[in-house]
Amino acid sequence: MDKLVIQGGVPLRGAIAVSGSKNAALPILMASILAEEPITYTNVPRLRDIFTTNKLLAILGCPAEFDGHTVTVTPCDLKPEAPYDLVKTMRASVLCLGPLLARLGEARVALPGGCAIGARPVDLHLTALEKMGATFDLDSGYIQGRCKKLRGAHIHFDFPTVGGTENLLMAATLAEGETILENVAREPEVVDLANFLIACGAKIEGHGSSVIKVQGVPRLGGCEYRIMPDRIEAGTFMVAAGITGGDLLLTDCPFEELEAVIAKLRDMGLIIEREGTRDVRVTHNGHLRARDVTTRPFPGFPTDMQAQIMALMTIASGAGVVEETIFENRFMHVPELVRMGADVKLSGHSAMVRGVQKLIGAPVMASDLRASASLVLAGLAAQGETHVQRIYHLDRGYERIEEKLNAVGARITRMPE
């Protein structure tokens, strides 16, 4: 198991290319199950979760070939079972449930794993699929689903679940008749999935709004599709510029998809400007101010940026409250930031952050993907040396993060623990 050793206190200057989006690529790759022809994906990030997804697709009968940042999937003899040894490492693997039911009328999927950040129930997925005609049993840790043929239905989500929206959107493309999904997730990654499905021949309207309408079609074909850039990686690098007092140009950077993050970072003192159509420059005016942050479904402030902006707030002037409304137990980075000298007090789903003059390097342990990123950011700003342990979480969601940061001045070494 590796760790990162970070020598802090170096302003970052230069250009960083934003990778393709992990959170868009995972469901889009799973949607390969729906297609009857080969598909070529470009701008695919080389991440542990992507490699796991490709292994899972191969087991399900959709072998995937990785070449650089291009993945070609060739559907052949589909099989209905997603085994535990792959699913246990990645919660997104439950997204094969809807496509398998739509194509085969059956699915046997192990209960998912992934980051340990509280309850992420799949009940919303199952309840909605039942309305389309599926039945489910829990058998030795596996979800066993069956249906004769999925039928279009009118489905209202109690909460705009991203995974539930994606699963039902995929299932509905091959269902009989029209499916109306209400109170759906509006995240850009959901829109990217819908655009991909449309490119394969699906009939979808309303993606990006709270109501999506899907008219089922008999089959989906193949296409070539470019995965959107990763807005969370881009936001993380924006914070890296601010927390080190640096000057970064982020190339192929999403902007509209990051409006809530950019607005909050500007309010804290960062200068964020577009350069051309797809590049963004990030600096700051020398004075960081703490601000209140509340996570919300898109277009609100994303929960996946909560830990990173908290790291920035630890060295800002004043105090701010970070409120987490999406996931429970998503403050596991707080004790580690406190080890580095941060002043953070927890109270239920909120954290009071009071800025300190400096952070001090220390050994810290990553507990989930975004917590890992916050500790790397804190290490970049800290005085002295920081050891971030258990970085396998980081490798699930950030492509070569230490190489990208070192290229703009950071001093980070990967080594065995």
UniProtKB/Swiss-Prot annotation:
One of its GO terms (cellular component) is cytoplasm. Pathway: Cell wall biogenesis; peptidoglycan biosynthesis. One of its GO terms (molecular function) is UDP-N-acetylglucosamine 1-carboxyvinyltransferase activity. The modification 2-(S-cysteinyl)pyruvic acid O-phosphothioketal is found at C115. Transmembrane segments: none annotated. UDP-N-acetyl-alpha-D-glucosamine binds at R91, R120, P121, V122, D123, L124, D304, I326. GO terms for biological process: cell division; cell wall organization; peptidoglycan biosynthetic process; regulation of cell shape; UDP-N-acetylgalactosamine biosynthetic process. It is an enzyme of class 2 (transferase). Pfam families: EPSP_synthase. It catalyses: phosphoenolpyruvate + UDP-N-acetyl-alpha-D-glucosamine = UDP-N-acetyl-3-O-(1-carboxyvinyl)-alpha-D-glucosamine + phosphate. The active site is at C115. Keywords: Cell cycle, Cell division, Cell shape, Cell wall biogenesis/degradation, Cytoplasm, Peptidoglycan synthesis, Pyruvate, Transferase. Its EC number is 2.5.1.7. Gene3D superfamilies: Enolpyruvate transferase domain. It is found in: Cytoplasm. SUPFAM superfamilies: EPT/RTPC-like. It comes from the Bacteria. InterPro entries: Enolpyruvate_Tfrase_dom, Enolpyruvate_Tfrase_sf, MurA_subfamily, RNA3'P_cycl/enolpyr_Trfase_a/b, UDP_GlcNAc_COvinyl_MurA. Cell wall formation. Adds enolpyruvyl to UDP-N-acetylglucosamine. This is UDP-N-acetylglucosamine 1-carboxyvinyltransferase. It comes from Nitratidesulfovibrio vulgaris (strain DSM 19637 / Miyazaki F) (Desulfovibrio vulgaris).
